[in-house]
Design a protein with these regions (language model features):
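N-terminal segments that mediate ammonia production and transfer
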Residues: 1-39
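A short, hydrophobic C-terminal helix/tail in secreted or cell-surface proteins
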Residues: 237-241
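ATP-dependent adenylate-handling active sites, centered on carboxylate activation for C-N bond formation
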Residues: 27-236
Length: 241
């Protein structure tokens, strides 16, 4: 998080985590080391797996209808699968008894015939969500740009472009009464999923770039994900007032 200092006219980070420093993580095991201990490596993989499942499960402790955003990519597919796993169990029985209601709904948005929609449909069929595929036209996207800029409060071209489909998707989600959605946002920054990460010259350069990307999430990807969806899921249609 950040706080604003008026006299300086800029934002300040209010905390620094130890993992932000390369020296704090440089000795972590990974398969690239010739002397890697298989048991230790598997223990760390299991720890990440368990932490991710626990994080998703924690978000499902909600008293409002929820769903998942499913693009068909690895990140959103994993989150959707975990959400389906726990949404299918009753919390009050410590996830032992099956839950017959509510059923988990997944949502995908794109131009008609987009490859991502096909992949999202396949994943939804595999994990068993009630899937909703929302198509929009180029003209609908252009018509929405004014409202998108109003809600996300930025003129950054890339952010506006990526926010427009999410805004159109949010309108459909809201009309269905869904109040909360999970997505795979942030995974590429945490795990170095972008293609250019493969060209990192050193482990330190890789780590420093992931930290840099994480520190800027609130300006771009999270700005898009939070504001383009939250403006419709949690507020009135302010742009029409």
């Amino acid at each position: 998080g950040h706080y604003y200092r008026g006299r300086e006219g800029k934002m300040h980070r209010w905390y620094t985590r130890d993992w932000m420093q390369y020296l704090a993580v440089k000795d972590n095991y990974h398969t690239g080391y010739p002397d890697v201990n298989a048991t230790t490596y598997q223990t760390q993989v299991s720890a990440v797996h368990d932490a991710l499942e626990a994080a998703v499960q924690r978000q499902l402790m909600s008293d409002v209808p929820y769903g998942v955003l499913l693009s068909g990519g690895l990140d959103s597919s994993v989150i959707s699968a975990i959400a389906k796993k726990y949404a299918g169990k009753r919390i009050e029985t410590d996830n032992k008894a099956d839950a017959w209601w509510p059923q988990l709904h997944s949502f995908a948005v794109g131009l008609k015939g987009a490859p991502d929609l096909i992949k999202a449909r396949e994943v939804a069929q595999y994990i068993g969500t009630i899937h909703h595929e929302i198509n929009y036209t180029i003209q609908e996207g252009l018509d929405a740009i004014r409202d998108v800029i109003y809600f996300i409060e930025t003129y950054d071209v890339t952010t506006v472009r990526a926010s427009t489909p999410m805004y159109l998707l949010a309108r459909v989600i809201k009309s269905m009464g869904i109040k909360m959605v999970l997505s795979g946002e942030g995974a590429d920054e945490v795990f170095g999923g972008y293609l250019y990460f493969h060209k990192a010259p050193t482990p330190q350069a890789f780590h420093e770039e992931t930290v840099r990307k994480l520190s800027k999430l609130y300006l771009y990807d999270c700005l898009r994900a939070n504001k383009s969806l939250a403006c419709l899921l949690y507020t009135s249609d302010a742009a029409d007032e």
